[in-house]
Amino acid sequence: MEAERRHRALYKGTTPPWKETYRKRCVERLKSNRSKLLDKFRQVGERIHGGVGGSFLVQEVMEEEWKVMQFENGGFPSMWKKDAFSQDPDELATLEEIKQELLLEEKAMVEEFENILQFEEQCFDSVVELSTGDQIVCPVCNRNYLTVTSCFIVCQCGVYINTQSQGMSIEKLHSLLESNLTAHAYHCNKLPVFSVATELGGAASLFMSCQECDAMVVIL
């Protein structure tokens, strides 16, 4: 009770001095939990609405950040225990305002994730298009089927890559193409291109590159 009185005295008749600090901390925590939010979003698939109040992380973020401020300032009551937090209309309105801002921030992040997942599907489809049964279309020329053995990969367009040390197979090559396309799609919404380049030692390697984000990855 005494803690609550001290807490209310902090901002009686004025804008709560903790409001901006709490708001900024909540926004920063929400953004720092980006990967966690993406994992939660993946788990629910196409169901846009998450947990409490249609949110994935907002309630959790607000609770965690309030606990930090409560630890730093003994004048803050326990927000989430029954009858522990003040029912002052101004105080509740402040919290609701912060919550709505966080919900909008989370919504923007979810929309971004939707675009990422949609692009990942497009990339997966492009890999599927490269594969027909036990065959893979050459990602360099996009016309001919590759001949894949444990020792080499070859295409009529001129692609020849020695894979003797890697023990290559159709399944392994498909997995490499899919995983690299998916990883690229996480941070860029443009489809990359594939090429073969000869290194200093004379060995040929398969590269995946993107002009949009300047990414370049050695696939083989």
From Swiss-Prot:
GO terms for molecular function: zinc ion binding. It is found in: Nucleus. Keywords: Metal-binding, Nucleus, Zinc, Zinc-finger. The keyword Zinc applies. Residues 1-45 are annotated as: Interaction with importin beta. Residues 49-165 are annotated as: Interaction with RPA1. It holds the Pfam family RPA_interact_N. Its main location: nucleus. Transmembrane segments: none annotated. One of its GO terms (cellular component) is nucleus. GO terms for biological process: protein import into nucleus. It comes from the Eukaryota. InterPro entries: RIP, RPA_interact_C_dom, RPA_interact_N_dom. A zinc finger (RIP-type) spans 138-213. Mediates the import of RPA complex into the nucleus, via its interaction with importin beta. PANTHER family: RPA-INTERACTING PROTEIN, RPA-INTERACTING PROTEIN RPAIN. Interacts directly with the RPA1 subunit of RPA complex. Interacts with importin beta, but not with importin alpha. Forms a complex with the RPA complex and importin beta, which is dissociated by Ran-GTP. This is RPA-interacting protein B. It comes from Xenopus laevis. The lineage of its organism: Eukaryota, Metazoa, Chordata, Craniata, Vertebrata.
